[in-house]
Amino acid sequence: MVVLSVPAEVTVILLDIEGTTTPIAFVKDILFPYIEENVKEYLQTHWEEEECQQDVSLLRKQAEEDAHLDGAVPIPAASGNGVDDLQQMIQAVVDNVCWQMSLDRKTTALKQLQGHMWRAAFTAGRMKAEFFADVVPAVRKWREAGMKVYIYSSGSVEAQKLLFGHSTEGDILELVDGHFDTKIGHKVESESYRKIADSIGCSTNNILFLTDVTREASAAEEADVHVAVVVRPGNAGLTDDEKTYYSLITSFSELYLPSST
């Protein structure tokens, strides 16, 4: 087994979710299709609720910002109280959500609605989050060694908490010290990692970031964050240069903490 020694100054391990803690197949084949298949029914059921209206308002604002994009789907403001008007608006939201998802967009508006839909599904027991078998034992070991563990994902903080609170391993939220999403910045921007360090109250070089995406790893490195690229089944392939340049692990168990000996 290849062992990657964690630098002595590291006190925080920052984890990506998709392709790192959780199989991409779970996200691509279960989580995202659930949204596309159920968004219309969800909107019709929850439309009158304040939370749903806030979600729609945020999506409408995003649609206005996207108006210049090819194929952008507008969301009209309500023009009356008629049933036809309501159904047209719901369909516009459905079309907008599906358009954004077809482009794999990570807008806060989209992520917020997805998070609320997943909350309804997880709390109703309609799905449980999947984690790679090495994740929970490794995170427990890190915490016993005094490490802080944080999550940084393009999925909303609320969605992250749902995954860790309703997993096949049970409720494992207690293993996580905190959560970050795109509200702090995008994962391919180095400034996001500086903001995360400020929020945690540490230096960027006290953080080890584990991700499967090399663009994110590069952005983190620019901020003086330590990185390791996680190679998992189903993840995008790496170039020969990337394989040579980055520290690679295929399991969290391959991390060696000098402080734990």
Curated annotation (Swiss-Prot):
EC number of this enzyme: 3.1.3.77
Primary site of residence: cytoplasm
Reaction(s) the record says it catalyses: 5-methylsulfanyl-2,3-dioxopentyl phosphate + H2O = 1,2-dihydroxy-5-(methylsulfanyl)pent-1-en-3-one + phosphate
Single GO cellular component term: nucleus
Keyword check for Chaperone: no
Pfam families cross-referenced by the UniProt entry: Hydrolase (PF00702)
Localization: Cytoplasm; Nucleus
Cofactor stoichiometry and binding remark: Binds 1 Mg(2+) ion per subunit.
GO biological process, one term: L-methionine salvage from methylthioadenosine
Covalent S-S links between cysteines: none
Residues the record lists as binding substrate: 153-154, 187
Keywords noted in UniProt: Amino-acid biosynthesis, Cytoplasm, Hydrolase, Magnesium, Metal-binding, Methionine biosynthesis, Nucleus
Keyword 4Fe-4S in record: no
Protein residues bound to Mg(2+): 16, 18, 212
Cofactor(s) annotated in UniProt: Mg(2+)
Pathway per the UniProt entry: Amino-acid biosynthesis; L-methionine biosynthesis via salvage pathway; L-methionine from S-methyl-5-thio-alpha-D-ribose 1-phosphate: step 3/6; Amino-acid biosynthesis; L-methionine biosynthesis via salvage pathway; L-methionine from S-methyl-5-thio-alpha-D-ribose 1-phosphate: step 4/6
MF-aspect GO terms: acireductone synthase activity; magnesium ion binding
Family, per entry: Belongs to the HAD-like hydrolase superfamily. MasA/MtnC family.
Functional description taken from the UniProt entry: Bifunctional enzyme that catalyzes the enolization of 2,3-diketo-5-methylthiopentyl-1-phosphate (DK-MTP-1-P) into the intermediate 2-hydroxy-3-keto-5-methylthiopentenyl-1-phosphate (HK-MTPenyl-1-P), which is then dephosphorylated to form the acireductone 1,2-dihydroxy-3-keto-5-methylthiopentene (DHK-MTPene).
Record's subunit section: Monomer.
Protein name: Enolase-phosphatase E1
The organism of origin for this protein: Homo sapiens
